[in-house]
Amino acid sequence: NGILYMQVLQRDTKVSGKGSDDNRSYLLALEPKTGKQLWKTYRPAKARSESLEAFSTPIPYSHDGRDEIVIVGGDCLTGHDPKTGSELWRWGTWNPSRITHWRLVPSPVAGNGVILACGPKRAPVFAIKAGAKGDVSSESKSVAWNSEGSRDGVTSDVSTPLFYRDNFYVLYGEGRDKM
């Protein structure tokens, strides 16, 4: 639709190898031809230190007639209205003990009514049901499935999964697995 969406980790004037607790990330929409800012939405997070950081990319996703931008980072996965940036839903339960060194690399991927998000550092892969509203972190019904307890603990610390021909593919460890 001619709009560029990006996640930005805003740092204060201090620069360090680790994030600091006052970093604020946001999702930004720009008009590509002019660079004009269309909207900016801050993404509050309970994450601390390095766990605030993410190298993920926002993804557009449409399900049951609802368009949204999905992004992961700061120990949470969120869906946003692409026209306004407002947060539609939030899920974040893969780091309940608030480990501080869980920087996230893989981007989410979506298909068949679920949004796949990989936790960092060998944490499980989670499939969150599309169409959520509000904070669904405590709702077990919002999770379609996860890889906890699966053979070899399927996870992806760096590679973004692939949705292809109605299947999700996750590259992990020494091999590959189709979920």
Predicted stretch roles:
Residues N1-M179:
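Noncatalytic, solvent-exposed loop/strand surfaces
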